[in-house]
Amino acid sequence: MSYVSKKMPKGVTPLYFIQAFSTFSFAILYSSLSLYITQQLGFSNTISNNIVGVFLAFNYVLHLWGGVLGGRYLSNRLLFFITNIMQGAGILVLILPGHSMLYFGLSLFLVGCGLNTTCYNSILTQRFKPEDEEQRDKAFFLSYAAMNVGFFSGYILSGFYDYSNEYQELFCISIATSLITAFILLFYWSCFEDNHTPLKAVTKSISRKKRELAGIVSTAVLVPLMIVCFHFSHLSNAVVVVLSSIMLLVILFLGKRQKDKADFQKIKAFLILTITSILFWMIYYTGPMGITLFIKNNVDKHFLGYEIATQWIMNINAVVIIIGAPIVSMIINRLKAKGVNLSISMQFVWAFLILAVSFLFLSIGVEFADSQGFSSLSWIILHLITQSVAELLIGPVGYAMIGKISPTNLQGILMGTWMMVSGVSASLSHYFSNAMVKTEAADPIVTNNDFLHVFNQLAIWALVGAIFLYFISGRVKNLIDNEEEIKTEEITV
């Protein structure tokens, strides 16, 4: 860690700790929400999938609004602080018993974590100059690992409550991590100042205060809007898709207005990779919905005579990423040093291929289920390991890509949009998850066919994504590297 501290700009290392602690409470809900809703509150599997789908979808849609607010109406560090408090307040509301406070608590929490994620990534991105590619890539891989330390801790703790189905005490513990996050942020406040943002250009005190007031009010208004969205989940999912489509068109328009043609070329590459990433995350986000229920009800979770909690099994993802992130970063940097330049688009191709393999493991597990319909735990472990490797080749790479190709004035919007399209994926993935649970039965013999059908479909879709990206990877690389423009200029000369 000291090596990283010497090489990285001031403030980067504290950001890793902020990432880990702020992720903890999200990990609690990410791993336990569907179980909390069905086991403790008594909702059906379909309603649970709808709620979790809205939760995931709007978490990512709010990333876009975080990109708009941060650096324009509120500084990224101030917005992060406010939303971190909201995140903790949402957990506090969920501690209250009964169904009536569920949507209010989830809405408070959702606005908090939805907005502050983009703030965090913007703060980290702004620690580097555009030409600091190697340092920036390494920082985002390590940040991704730190995030998964939070997931790992949340999953471990959640597992202790998997059988009791009493989650109030678990929620109390997660409030403490929000307080720790706030303390670290305040202690290193001066290290997280915005660089080259529109708000920094506002010199008049009155104009700045008006912007800040507008930012605070618009943040507060989001809470009742989220409550409405939870009550009308099907309409909400359609809204997510429409908003994302509009935003992609807006970015295309903004790209055409760029004075530098090279910036427009890079924005076109960004849009291509963003649209294809929707398919990847749509497949990936069946995890916290359908696959969690599959592991809970259709897998023999015994290991060495002990039954392992569902959340602990899901924790394999976090462990692989914590260990794998620095290793993958090191491998990519060594390949670059040897002249082997693995382009962003080709990393995406490998991500899709490995994701397809991960779902084939689940299908094989169902095909070789025992006489009672239970799949072997080994196939689940293989699925989670390969899925995690696929995530490493698209998650941190995408964040680092923004710092490389984005014009300074569009950095927050592009970062928010990149994260927002995951909301479209979550909206679509809940349909696959519902296809897995057409019946409320928990008997594996009854439900295995539904799961097998969907697993095969997801593997095929991932393979299609890999093939499509492979054939356009050269075009995308040229857009990012601006090779076509250089060739055109040479011909003109």
Regions found by a protein language model. Give the residues of each.
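Intracellular loop-helix junctions on the cytosolic face of multi-pass helical membrane proteins
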Residues: 1-10, 131, 162-292, 297-302, ...
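Short amphipathic helix-loop junctions that connect adjacent transmembrane helices
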Residues: 29-47, 287-312
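Central cavity-lining transmembrane alpha-helices of secondary-active solute carriers
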Residues: 52-70, 315-328
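Conserved MFS/SLC helix-loop-helix module at the cytosolic interface between two early adjacent transmembrane helices
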Residues: 63-98
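Cytoplasmic membrane-interface "Motif A"-like loop-to-helix N-cap segments
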Residues: 72-84, 334-353
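C-terminal ends and interior cores of transmembrane alpha-helices
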Residues: 85-103, 350-372
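Intracellular juxtamembrane helix-capping segments at the cytosolic ends
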Residues: 115-130, 392-406
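Glycine-rich segments within core transmembrane alpha-helices of 12-TM secondary carriers
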Residues: 135-156, 162, 177-181, 218, ...
